[in-house]
Each structure stands twice: as C-alpha cells, then as structure tokens.
C-alpha cells in the first residue's frame, strides 16, 4: 500500500486508507486500489511531473541562459499528464511542436557568452532528443566519434542538422573540419529525412520516424524508464544506454509491444507493472547484483523518498501544509 501510493501519486496513504485496505478481504483489492490511485488525476500529474521535468530537461531555471532564450513546457506537460495524452502524441508535439506550448524541449538553452560548439542549440537538440527518447548518449559523439558506444560525430551532427536553420559544419573537439552535416536519422531502416526539406518539414519527418510502427526503440526506451522508476533499476541499465544487454530481453520486448499496441497509454503501462507479481514481491535490499556483476531480479530495490515526497509526507503527518501559496496550484491541502 505504501509503496504503490508513493510510486503512483507521491503521497503516503492516510491512516483511514490503510485501515480500510487491511480490513478488505476481497481478492481484487490491490487492483481496485491501483485504479483508484491512477484515477486521482491531480495527484498523479503533480507527482509524475517531476519525472518528466527531469527527463525532458524542463527543470532547468538557472541564470546561465539568455533572458527569453528558452521557454519551459510546464503548462503543456501538466495538461498532457492530466489528460493522459498518448505518448506518441506527446512525442509528436515535442519534436514538431504545433504551437508555442511545447517548443521549449527542442529549443534548448541559449548560454551567455562564448560556449563550446557542442553546446550550440542544434547540438543540444541532437543530445536531448536522442538521450530522452532513444536512450542514446550523444554527448561524446557531439565532440568526436564516441569512445564508449557505436555513435559517430557524423551521426550526432546529422540529427543536429535536422533542427539547424543554417548549413551546419562539423566541429571535432571544437575545431572545424570543413565538412557540412547532412540532416539524417540514425536508424535508416525505417525511413530517412529529406535534407532538402524546410526545417519544419524535417521536424515533421523526424516526428513520423519517432512514432513509426516499426520503431521499437522509442517504446522500449520509455517502458524501460517507467520500469526503472518503479523498480529502482531498469531492465536495461543504465537507462540512457539502451544498447546495453537487458537482463530480460523478452520482458522488455513484451512491455514495449503491449505499450505500442494499446495506444501508447502511459497509465495502462504503469498499471501493468504495478499489478505484476514482480512489483508486488518483497523488496530486494542488496540490489540483485551477484558476484561477477551479473544482475538477477529479486524484487524492487528500496528507494529513498524524493524531496517532493518528503515535504508532502511531513506536511501530511504534521498537518503543517501551507494555508496559502504564492502561485496557482491544484492539489488539495491535506488536513
């Protein structure tokens, strides 16, 4: 009860909820509890907003960027989660924004002063879309052919050129090469970008490729992230290295296929995971890492409360939640 409440809505169950759950002898009480939690749209949204803010680099609000240079997507993201917008629709609106509400993700951060070429807006675009949505770390490849993965400088710049308004010269370790990048998608088996198209057309083509029915990379990446968030460790680990061998490839493929075939429904996939025996089993305090480094799943890994969960728990237990806030909010004050 405590685990699933914190995982799905970020809040501890109340004493009344705990007593009612323990007194309920019906065999489907866990399923009903999970459906009730997922139906608490505001609590669900405000809890999972933290996960998506981190993933989409929307939590950055420091002073390093030029004023007005980057628009956060908080309003769009909040509504997408509250409405349980399908993930493929979210991806389309992030990659090829239909309006200003979701532009912040691809626009990146305009740093003050002179910065490395690897921090230019087109390269940030390449790094962000590949890491967040494909589980690919393009940061090394943005400077030189990666030493730790298969990705090359040309592939990193190929993605960057999709976004770039101007011809984009490849720089290796901040030194110009004289080579102009050609807009390209790194998985040509399912299609390719037309380099001669306009920027908006290229972004539309890229969005189509991200949600292509034969693109298994995107659904695998997001279900692996959801599994990792709930279980403490992904089926593929690290989460941003999807080229790593999964500890159970069949499980990953099945979850990704189910996700695709059922409308990219995030809540449905969360429900699928938390109703499983794997999630509801006893926690694994040692983390499942056996001698030699091989991972064996022995149960969910214990997780610390997040900062948000900790504050909410203190407010809930002490009855000290603020009576007024300095910004609009939707979550009810716990009494």
Task: Outline where the language-model segments fall.
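Cell-envelope and extracellular/periplasmic
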Residues: 211
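Glycine- and hydrophobic-rich flexible loops that cap the catalytic core of alpha/beta enzyme folds
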Residues: 199
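Flexible, polar/acidic helix-loop-strand segments at domain edges
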Residues: 195
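Short, structured secondary-structure elements
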Residues: 1-192, 203-206, 215-257, 264-335
């Amino acid at each position: 009860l405590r685990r699933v409440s914190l995982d799905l809505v970020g809040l501890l169950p109340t004493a009344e909820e705990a007593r009612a759950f323990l007194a309920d002898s019906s065999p489907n009480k866990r399923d009903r509890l999970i459906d009730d939690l997922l139906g608490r749209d505001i609590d669900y949204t405000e809890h999972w907003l933290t996960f998506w803010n981190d993933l989409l680099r929307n939590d950055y609000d420091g002073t390093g960027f030029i004023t007005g240079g980057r628009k956060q997507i908080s309003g769009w993201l909040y509504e997408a989660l509250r409405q349980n917008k399908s993930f493929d629709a979210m991806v389309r609106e992030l990659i090829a924004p239909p309006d200003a509400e979701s532009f912040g993700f691809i626009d990146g951060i305009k740093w003050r002063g002179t910065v490395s070429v690897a921090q230019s807006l087109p390269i940030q675009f390449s790094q962000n879309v590949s890491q967040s949505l494909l589980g690919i770390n393009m940061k090394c490849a943005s400077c030189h052919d990666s030493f730790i993965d298969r990705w090359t400088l040309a592939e990193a710049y190929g993605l960057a050129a999709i976004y770039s308004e101007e011809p984009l010269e490849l720089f290796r370790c901040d030194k110009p090469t004289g080579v102009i990048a050609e807009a390209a998608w790194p998985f040509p088996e399912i299609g390719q970008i037309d380099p001669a198209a306009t920027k908006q057309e290229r972004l539309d083509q890229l969005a189509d490729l991200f949600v292509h029915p034969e693109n298994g990379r995107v659904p695998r990446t997001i279900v692996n992230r959801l599994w990792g968030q709930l279980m403490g460790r992904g089926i593929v680990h690290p989460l941003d290295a999807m080229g790593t061998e999964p500890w159970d490839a069949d499980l990953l493929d099945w979850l990704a296929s189910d996700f695709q075939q059922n409308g990219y429904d995030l809540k449905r996939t969360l429900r699928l995971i938390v109703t499983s025996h794997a999630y509801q089993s006893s926690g694994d305090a040692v983390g499942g890492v056996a001698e030699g480094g091989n991972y064996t799943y022995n149960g969910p890994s214990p997780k610390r409360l997040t900062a948000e969960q900790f504050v909410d728990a203190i407010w809930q237990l002490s009855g000290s939640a603020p009576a007024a806030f300095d910004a609009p909010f939707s979550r009810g004050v716990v009494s």
